[in-house]
């Protein structure tokens, strides 16, 4: 319905990714404004491009961030850039629902500090904003960099709420923490049962992402797994009731042929 939503956007190994990749892509697609830009957490590989976008004057109406996002230098810088750009910041916690036309974001994580973490301080990965996305019958989950403990916490909450009925047999799943073996647990994936799993990682990452264990869990859950390191930009659509994923590099190869 004319809304443009963006989740994260950064790189730890590509300089000026916002200026030379994200912004040109948005302009090429004719996107004149981002209505809501979601920030899962403040690692450079998730926000470096956003920082450049906000500094460029490109309009972003809302930033959606976790209410429990740690107050570090990156958060303070984002808040300052958003204020200078006239971008409104919305703080989300578990159970919050945000509507954009037919699309809705439901926050699955984090919850309140006392309930979620026993009042203890935690790192920014554990406090990543996790969202369930739904538009008509098209559904997906964005996970940030949460670990297996947070996945279990989300499942426990879903089992106690009506929201849980909709967060299963989803169309796409953005693999947690780039396919880390400390995330993407069997129980979490089997409960979500995603048709397609998307793994964002580079060939040269020093962490060995994605792990064989995580990919195995995705495949065991019945997911088709796609990787940005192999396919470049990934596009998921639903056609005739089935989710389909195409990669930019595959499309480019077919075009040349």
Model-derived features with residue positions:
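Non-globular, low-confidence helical/coil segments that flank catalytic cores
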Residues: 1-257
